[in-house]
Curated annotation (Swiss-Prot):
One of its GO terms (biological process) is aromatic amino acid family biosynthetic process. CDD domains: DHQS. HAMAP family: DHQ_synthase (MF_00110). Its main location: cytoplasm. Pathway: Metabolic intermediate biosynthesis; chorismate biosynthesis; chorismate from D-erythrose 4-phosphate and phosphoenolpyruvate: step 2/7. Keywords: Amino-acid biosynthesis, Aromatic amino acid biosynthesis, Cobalt, Cytoplasm, Lyase, Metal-binding, NAD, Nucleotide-binding, Zinc. It is found in: Cytoplasm. Zn(2+) binds at E183, H247, H264. This is 3-dehydroquinate synthase. Pfam families: DHQ_synthase (PF01761), DHQS_C (PF24621). The keyword Aminoacyl-tRNA synthetase does not apply. It catalyses: 7-phospho-2-dehydro-3-deoxy-D-arabino-heptonate = 3-dehydroquinate + phosphate. GO terms for molecular function: 3-dehydroquinate synthase activity; metal ion binding; nucleotide binding.
Length: 359
């Protein structure tokens, strides 16, 4: 299989996204984006058991240190971010490179540590979950959670490279693999109706982890995010806000359930359906398109309803702790069509509460 490459260029700071097989064995590739002789690999307990030793062998001629996080969203906190910084402060200089080996949690906290250590050092994303490969590793958003809300403390800090080894998907549990599909569906809904149709036609092969199809859809999802991030790195124009389709609902669900009870992609799936239903209620999205979204997510075995244990008042209150609030108005991403998302602040509290209570 030929390795595919997607080039990102944010503020004249280009970096590549590589997508292929056996990239964790490619010494030349993995060393190419390290400018000094120090690296720190940050991973979690599960991923480290599979891939840490081979990656350390690539850097055997470097000072190579490691930091292993416990597994789970509940450890994406200031406490563990500070522990990473403390280990860096012991003997790492400004030309060190952090390597995030893992899923979205590892990538987010590693990127935030890299953004803050000595006012910013290099880092490389090596995402090992489908969700991280198509979304979290691309675009430079780094953060940790706070008890009040998800990703409330963070920074924009672009990686030097994103290295996606498709072989890491072989060790990904089925639930996490399917959760990652939610972000691929989101990318299609935002910008590319044809891509959405392709997902409908190829989903059976994708769920069988066919690498040829997976490489193609990961590349297309990465291109969609690349184009948006290139145009609006820090959500100034509103373009990047489109990537939050379903996420205002999703972040509230995650927080209310307790981080880790639902996977992020599972919450995103429910959030996508809520956004589509609200779009239909406001006469933006036709009923057949809404049905197609629900059918595709159901085929993946992802949730299309928010949990019954959460009531409308709780969900609405939690949504206001999200970052998509401006001038005390909630900005939601809605759909005018498959492949056409828009930013809206035209949903007031009364309408939103009625929608959440009655659908």
């Amino acid at each position: 299989m030929k390795t595919e490459r997607v080039n990102v260029n944010v503020n004249n700071q280009p970096y590549p996204i590589y997508i292929g097989e056996n990239l964790l064995q490619d010494k030349s590739l993995l060393q190419r984006h390290v400018k000094g002789r120090q690296v720190m690999i940050v991973s979690n307990e599960t991923i480290a058991a599979f891939y840490l030793d081979p990656l350390k062998a690539i850097y055997q001629d470097f000072q190579c240190d490691t930091f292993i996080l416990p597994d789970g969203e509940q450890y994406k906190t200031l406490e563990y971010w500070e522990r990473i910084l403390h280990k860096l402060a012991c003997n790492h200089h400004r030309d060190t490179t952090l390597i995030a080996l893992g899923g979205g949690v590892v990538g987010d906290i590693t990127g935030f540590a890299a953004a803050c250590y000595q006012r910013g050092v290099d880092f490389i994303q090596v995402p090992t979950t489908l969700l991280a490969q198509v979304d979290a590793s691309i675009g430079g958003k780094t953060a940790v959670n706070h008890p009040v809300g998800k990703n409330l403390i963070g920074a924009f800090h672009q990686p030097k490279a994103v290295i996606i080894d498709l072989n890491t998907l072989n060790t990904l549990p089925e639930r996490e693999f399917k959760a990652g599909m939610a972000e691929i569906v989101k990318a299609a809904l935002i910008k590319d109706e044809k891509f959405f149709t392709d997902l409908e036609n190829k989903m059976s092969d994708l769920l069988q982890r066919n690498f040829i199809f997976l490489q193609a859809v990961i590349k297309r999802a990465a291109e969609i995010k690349r184009d948006i991030v290139n145009a609006d790195e820090k959500e100034r124009s509103g373009e990047r806000a489109l990537l939050n389709l379903g996420h205002t609902f999703a972040h509230a669900i995650e927080r209310l359930l307790g981080y880790g009870q639902w996977l992020h992609g599972e919450a995103v799936s429910a959030g996508l359906v809520l956004a589509a239903q609200l779009s239909h209620r406001k006469n933006l999205l036709d009923f057949e398109s809404l049905q197609r979204i629900c059918r595709l997510l159901t085929q993946i075995s992802l949730p299309i309803h928010f949990p019954k244990s959460i009531n409308a008042d709780e969900l609405l209150s939690a949504m206001y702790m999200d970052k998509k609030v401006a001038n005390e108005r909630l900005h939601l991403i809605l759909l005018e069509d498959l492949g056409h998302a828009v930013v809206s602040d035209q949903v007031d509290d009364r309408e939103l509460k009625s929608f959440l209570e009655n659908g």
